[in-house]
Amino acid sequence: MEVDKKDEREAESSEQVVNPWEVSAKDGGKIDYDKLIDKFGCQRLDESLIDRVQRLTSRQPHVFLRRSVFFAHRDFNEILDAYERGDKFYLYTGRGPSSEALHLGHLIPFMFTKYLQEAFKVPLVIQLTDDEKSIWKNLSVEESQRLARENAKDIIACGFDVTKTFIFSDFDYVGGAFYKNMVKVGKCVTLNKAMGIFGFSGEDPIAKLSFPPVQAVPSFPSSFPHLFPGKDNLRCLIPCAIDQDPYFRMTRDVAPRLGYSKPALIESTFFPALQGENGKMSASDPNSAIYVTDSAKDIKNKINRYAFSGGQDSIEKHRELGANLEVDIPVKYLSFFLEDDSELEHIKKEYGEGRMLTGEVKKRLTEVLTEIVERHRRARAAVTDEMVDAFMAVRPLPSMFE
């Protein structure tokens, strides 16, 4: 019996792990997103939905939609059905502030959420989970709050509309109607269920057990009486990475029992580390990530030294066999950030058939990322403490649906 259990544990440890706190592929391979869709029970975002987005918004779908960066969903079709009938919705996304500066992987949900806000003309709430990071990263409450404000500046620099956006820190905002919803959610979820969903153990502090309702209830409009009074049936759409799915599986399970609509989700793949696709970019390993604070020299150095290449060992071999695009990180990064579809296809063809060399692809990636980081740095430098206060002020947003 003991041997069976040991085999089971070893089998589990060699499987991919995807949860809000850990992302790692099986035996150093790639994340299997089809397997994740089956395991989590979400649906693949297909061409028909992307075409509907284009038709309803009268603008080209975002590059993250066109290239399946956002690839899975829950009830996104229902959000579009309602929108087509003239019913609006609101957006909810968030950030766990655990580092001074954001890396490019952190920017992805915000870049996409900004597009959704502009395309559909809807309000947005952004949760800064400074409480979560204080618990999981063992940061002091004060340090977590400071990082939340610093991260808010990076988020604001993405270009959100202050007349349609409310940013809040959990330490500052939780209370009142928000807290009432937390208690309602907490009463619906047993300890066994929470341990099953989130993998909590008897060694974890009870603070961890209390957190999931905090991330759940921003998807209920009644948690924001200053924004949505009398709009308890307003639907919520959550753009996030797929590792956040467990929180919202729980939320969707309890929402109907509380008389609320289930939140809809649109979920992204992970932005891979420079060294390869067996996990996601990590703020704890500075060489695995490109930061928004990196200089042009830093970016060039990191790409040239650390970006895993699918090119061959020698020029002769490369000319003959071409690059392996499946594992090539510079090509992966270009597929996230190079806007021009035809240029991307050209690079893939030339590089994949050996006519373009690794150095040329890395040079183009360096140009693209340097421009994005420089643009972000300029925008962030213009964000003042007064602007942060304005986004975080508890206030109505009278023109939020215009």
Swiss-Prot record:
CDD domains referenced in this protein's UniProt entry, alphabetically: TrpRS_core
Name of the protein in its database record: Tryptophan--tRNA ligase, cytoplasmic
PANTHER family xrefs: TRYPTOPHAN--TRNA LIGASE, CYTOPLASMIC, TRYPTOPHANYL-TRNA SYNTHETASE
Coiled-coil features, chain-numbered ranges: none
Keywords: Aminoacyl-tRNA synthetase, ATP-binding, Cytoplasm, Ligase, Nucleotide-binding, Protein biosynthesis
NCBIfam families for this protein: trpS
Gene3D superfamilies named in the record: HUPs, Tyrosyl-Transfer RNA Synthetase
Annotated EC: 6.1.1.2
Source organism of the structure: Arabidopsis thaliana (Mouse-ear cress)
SUPFAM superfamilies: Nucleotidylyl transferase (SSF52374)
Statement: the UniProt record of this protein carries the keyword Nucleotide-binding: yes
Example of a GO cellular component annotation carried by this entry: cytosol
Gene Ontology molecular functions: ATP binding; tryptophan-tRNA ligase activity
Motif, 'KMSKS' region: chain positions: 280-284
Top-level taxonomy: Eukaryota, Viridiplantae, Streptophyta, Embryophyta, Tracheophyta
Catalytic activity: tRNA(Trp) + L-tryptophan + ATP = L-tryptophyl-tRNA(Trp) + AMP + diphosphate + H(+)
Localization in the cell: Cytoplasm, Cytosol
Motif ('HIGH' region): 97-106
Protein family: Belongs to the class-I aminoacyl-tRNA synthetase family.
Gene Ontology biological process: post-embryonic development; reproductive structure development; tryptophanyl-tRNA aminoacylation
